[in-house]
């Protein structure tokens, strides 16, 4: 209402200290990952329309034909020696058969191709990528999915199976998350979504990472508060707890440290999570 909207209730005090400001809503995102910005260096293959950090709209892919067609167009823009990496695919939304190497081989049989699923716990690769890492019908490794004839379908589930491909194709979650350009790109994504406080939910947080985050988030114009959760991996529980306490003491206004994330399982929507009957306990 106007300045006199409360006068009907008697004497009031008019506080005009904020009259020249614009109040905008904030939003807290409790499950997100820093690579949501830099991942746009790769080809988007998801179902929903998405806007990249620079404001460009990328249309969703409603069926496998569109996924393959759009990735084929993207492939034509790449140098001959560069792999094709896609991301964002979620088979749950697609009514077609499941993505396999036979689909990706339609794009190229000579260029290695990997498409990360939206949960980043699974990927599908083409025959060239399988060849690069030595996966074949003789491979006996958990996560290397095979068809009824015993041949790899191209689907790889969880890090143990995916990492050999990731290493050779240059898919590095750390560089997608902890470099200065990645942090700034993440902030752009948040800003476009109206997010003012966001986590990075499974962060390595080395000394170098913390130095970069402190410097970049400390800039007056940096638009978001980041609350990273330390990845509880690679050390004894007591050491992780001690490091988390150290991090907490280093918090700043726009970098809140000290949270820890335990990851003990896989992806529910990717069917790699080990949950009890009836499937969600």
Specify the residue positions occupied by each region the protein language model found.
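Accessory "access/gating" subregions that flank catalytic or transport cores
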Residues: 248-251
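Divalent metal-binding segments
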Residues: 1-243, 258, 262-281
């Amino acid at each position: 209402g106007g300045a006199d909207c409360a006068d009907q209730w008697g004497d009031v005090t008019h506080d005009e200290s904020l009259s020249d400001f614009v109040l905008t809503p904030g939003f807290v995102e409790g499950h997100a990952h820093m690579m949501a910005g830099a991942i746009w260096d790769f080809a988007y293959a998801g179902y929903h329309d998405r806007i990249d950090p620079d404001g460009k709209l990328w249309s969703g892919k409603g069926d496998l034909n569109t996924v393959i067609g759009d990735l084929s167009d993207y492939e034509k823009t790449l140098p001959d020696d560069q792999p094709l990496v896609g991301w964002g695919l979620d088979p749950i939304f697609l009514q077609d058969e499941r993505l396999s190497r036979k689909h990706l081989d339609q794009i190229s049989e000579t260029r290695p191709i990997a498409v990360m699923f939206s949960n980043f716990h699974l990927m599908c690769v083409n025959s060239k990528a399988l060849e690069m890492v030595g996966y074949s019908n003789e491979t006996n490794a958990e996560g290397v999915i095979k068809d009824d004839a015993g041949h790899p379908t191209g689907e790889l589930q969880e890090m143990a199976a995916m990492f050999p491909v990731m290493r050779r194709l240059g898919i590095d979650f750390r560089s997608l998350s902890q470099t200065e350009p990645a942090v700034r790109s993440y902030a752009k994504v948040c800003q476009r979504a109206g997010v003012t406080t966001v986590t990075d939910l499974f962060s390595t947080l080395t000394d170098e990472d913390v130095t970069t985050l402190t410097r970049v988030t400390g800039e007056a114009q940096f638009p978001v508060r980041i609350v990273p959760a330390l990845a509880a991996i690679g050390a004894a529980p007591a050491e992780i707890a001690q490091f988390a306490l150290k991090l907490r003491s280093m918090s700043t206004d726009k970098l809140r440290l000290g949270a820890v994330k335990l990851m003990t399982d896989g992806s529910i929507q990717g069917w790699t999570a080990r949950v009890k009957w009836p499937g969600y306990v």
